[in-house]
A protein has these predicted regions:
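Short N-terminal helix-initiation segments at or just after the protein's N-terminus
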Residues: 1-7, 28-32, 48-58, 86-97, ...
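Charged, gly/pro-rich active-site loop segments
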Residues: 2-21, 100-171
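Short, basic/aromatic recognition patches
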Residues: 18-39
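Structural motif corresponding to alpha-helix initiation and N-cap regions
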Residues: 26, 72-73
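Short beta-strand segments
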Residues: 36-71, 77-79, 87-91, 97-99
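Generic structural signal for secondary-structure transition and capping sites
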Residues: 37-38, 84, 132, 153
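Short, intrinsically disordered, mixed-charge
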Residues: 72, 81-85, 125-133
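A short, polar/proline- and glycine-enriched secondary-structure boundary/capping micro-motif
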Residues: 76-82, 166-168
């Protein structure tokens, strides 16, 4: 079966191996996603891309990320139509002289609407622990909680050095 989330990298390039062997790459990705509180959620619909800012929380193993959105939004509708998503998280500075220090991660995966129940409660707790101000928003019946199962991360430094990391059971 073809993975619908295949990267554009040439599989034979040593620089772009499916699983980067640098043990610090996972740690750099972890640090970045734990330090930043917001991501740009990238979705698509009708052949058009759409980006939206979301507050997020990753699972400890980096295999899942969770966010909440109102159900009466374009974001919710597009997530309901297509589960292929990406989240872009970066360390963008406010000063131009720090521009080459920017790191960015694109996490690609499949989104899942989480129905109220045990899993909803566990994931809501994860998100609220990171963003306590979202508690009433997360619990509102007019909002939906989504979990994204991460397929891979693309880590970028200095605007052109790209490596990928795939979370596994052995993270």
């Amino acid at each position: 079966m073809v993975n619908q989330d295949e990267p554009l990298f040439d599989r034979n390039s040593p620089m772009n191996s499916p699983q980067d062997s640098d043990p610090t790459l996972r740690d750099r990705i972890r640090r970045l996603v734990m330090e930043q509180e917001y991501a740009v959620l990238c979705v698509q619909g009708g052949g058009q891309p759409y980006g939206a800012l979301v507050a997020f929380a990753f699972s400890e193993d980096l295999r899942h990320v969770v966010f909440v959105t109102p159900t009466a939004t374009r974001k919710y509708r597009l997530l309901s139509e297509c589960d292929h998503v990406a989240l872009v998280i970066d360390s963008r500075p406010n000063k131009i002289d720090q521009l080459m220090d920017v790191e960015a991660v694109t996490a690609t995966g499949r989104s899942h609407l989480i129905e109220r129940g045990v899993e909803f409660d566990e994931l809501a707790e994860l998100l609220i622990a990171r963003h306590p101000y979202l508690k009433s928003f997360v619990q509102a019946t007019t909002c939906a909680l989504f979990r994204v199962d991460i397929v891979r991360f693309f880590h970028v430094v200095r605007f052109q050095e790209v490596r990928q990391w795939i979370p596994t059971d052995h993270c």
